[in-house]
Amino acid sequence: MIKDATAITLNPISYIEGEVRLPGSKSLSNRALLLSALAKGKTTLTNLLDSDDVRHMLNALKELGVTYQLSEDKSVCEIEGLGRAFEWQSGLALFLGNAGTAMRPLTAALCLSTPNKEGKNEIVLTGEPRMKERPIQHLVDALCQAGAEIQYLEQEGYPPIAIRNTGLKGGRIQIDGSVSSQFLTALLMAAPMAEADTEIEIIGELVSKPYIDITLKMMQTFGVEVENQAYQRFLVKGHQQYQSPHRFLVEGDASSASYFLAAAAIKGKVKVTGVGKNSIQGDRLFADVLEKMGAHITWGDDFIQVEKGNLKGIDMDMNHIPDAAMTIATTALFAEGETVIRNIYNWRVKETDRLTAMATELRKVGAEVEEGEDFIRIQPLNLAQFQHAEIETYNDHRMAMCFALIALSQTSVTILDPSCTAKTFPTFFDTFLRLTHAES
């Protein structure tokens, strides 16, 4: 391995073997922080992820008057719940980096605030340049139906936004579910604290349903039940208060597990702990995709183990695992026969346009790729056909981690800006290399 701040080169790997304790899930960490802040009582979160996205959420909560204590290794957080909506001084601006899991839920939660003795005031939510390209209009439109006052400060439909503390009335709300499940997650988490009951109707086909399951299960843990009518309509009683569960264990990140599990499916045997058959994360189903391709899978309550098999290409709708599906795109190069990943339009509105980015970088290593509007078709390569390439990562943690798998060929790979993995897995490359054995 050759590593500096701007690039890391991974030399050819002959096999991978070992055990990985997964860092906490980003999706669960930021949901748990927000629910703990709004709940009545003190909550101790364990196995919290220490990453950029979580840091942005923690900083925002501190600015909003939430008190918490973090352990030295930042994996345990004790939060004093407010037991009410947030309040703020007029003129406050929250910088949320490129953290969609902070921007979307906070947008909805801040709309719950009602005029205080200062009367109506505003709060601004902003972030990195890429955040200003990530759509938020479907969420804003839905919140405005419930009485929110939100203004776009630059480009219509995108952050930065200003929110006024007018409160959320509840009522009947229609929301487009076809771009991002985070919009619905944000609305669901705010709805119990609205003034009246809320009926949320989904327009279009709801994407990434397993992420909605995470939200509903976590709301239940914090004392709130939602009636889910076949993912088309959600009924939420208003005027409720979240109750602290006192302790909440953040599961290991199933999306982060995908890189190690895929590497094992190609060339070895790896056990990941912190996520298992009872996980509430949809990305645990990534292991089922590897099994369909020919890998050998063993499930435990708190682990998934994968052992290599003769991998075959697959043609599959992967809308239910959009983040982990990226890992299938690089795994496909090592399978026999073509792979088609379908119904993944929402790759285009993530940290970067992941469909174009993935197609571009796969071609650099020698692959034949067809990029569709909402699918990608990938032809495999023989181990000797891989070409050395410098992989652009587009400030996208998942691009960097996916392309580590290229080193399982007979060719080294150089990954630019490897520190972008700090978004969810700051120690990824060290952890990955600890399990690998070099080609002799």
From Swiss-Prot:
Give the UniProt family note.
Belongs to the EPSP synthase family.
Q: Which GO terms describe its biological process?
A: amino acid biosynthetic process; aromatic amino acid family biosynthetic process; chorismate biosynthetic process
Q: What is this protein called?
A: 3-phosphoshikimate 1-carboxyvinyltransferase
Question: Its catalytic activity?
Answer: 3-phosphoshikimate + phosphoenolpyruvate = 5-O-(1-carboxyvinyl)-3-phosphoshikimate + phosphate
Alphabetical list of NCBIfam families matching this protein? aroA (TIGR01356)
- Assembly and oligomerization: Monomer.
Kindly state which keywords UniProt assigns to this record, in alphabetical order.
Amino-acid biosynthesis, Aromatic amino acid biosynthesis, Cytoplasm, Transferase
* Purpose of the protein: Catalyzes the transfer of the enolpyruvyl moiety of phosphoenolpyruvate (PEP) to the 5-hydroxyl of shikimate-3-phosphate (S3P) to produce enolpyruvyl shikimate-3-phosphate and inorganic phosphate.
Q: Name one GO molecular function term.
A: 3-phosphoshikimate 1-carboxyvinyltransferase activity
Source organism's superkingdom?
Answer: Bacteria
